[in-house]
């Protein structure tokens, strides 16, 4: 999850259990709204591209372009379980990392990806922005490894700065209104709470347990995000990931921490070799995207790191 998905101040305090679909999330707390799924799924078009650090315009990044690519800030990093390919979601679209010198832009759709998660082989979910409307794309889906994208839900209404698939559901943090939301079918959503959080991670064992980075430190929910409590005596972390071995976190200074009791006790394991943007863990390997278009990996719990992508 991305470092810059900073906690925001909610506009109001809702009740829990609200469901919403489509363009609005403002119904009464106890009211459930289920709107028919969007018809005629369409491939999303190009997005306004933010300026890259030391790079050219978006025209430099066409589908299949490979080599010394600069992709700027990374908002998500994940492995495709089918191909074992490493993917990074950025302000200028989705890139596949083939080797330490080769990054391939996967899609012609210049999507500004703010949230990104992997469902299965070549099956991705994302959120972000599009220049040709809607400005907030809601939840979008790709079933061809990111080559094309289709609308799923909340088009025009949601900008998920955090997404995670766990326990058969999608968990998301909507930056437009501070809503923590969950969907079992990727179309209708239950708003669990409104709270100021950034990165979050769902327990792989218990779908009701969620850790999140709040304004005043780490927050824990034991009811699936409906309520949150502060976790005392924790390091000042900015990025989170959770796998079968425990919780992993990266602090703002790059320090890597781990916890085997759900965030109660923490052990410092090492540090990433740069300023962290995004962080993930899969199959006992830690991945970190760093400022400067660099991606690194660790197989010893963060003690040492090797380059997965480091353009010259």
Regions found by a protein language model. Give the residues of each.
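Asp-box/BNR beta-propeller loop motif
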Residues: 92-106, 138-153, 181-192, 219-230, ...
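Short, solvent-exposed loop/turn segments at conserved positions within beta-propeller repeat blades
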Residues: 131-136, 173-176, 212-213, 251-252
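Residue-level detector of Asp-centered blade-edge/turn motifs that repeat once per structural unit
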Residues: 79-83, 118-121, 165-168, 204-207, ...
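Terminal targeting segments of Actinobacterial cell-envelope proteins
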Residues: 1-30
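Beta-strand-rich domains and repeat architectures in extracellular enzymes and scaffolds
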Residues: 66-95, 111-116
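Short coil/turn segments at the loop-to-beta-strand junctions that recur within blades
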Residues: 109-114, 155-160, 194-200, 233-238, ...
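C-terminal region of N-terminal signal peptides and the immediate post-cleavage residues
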Residues: 46-68
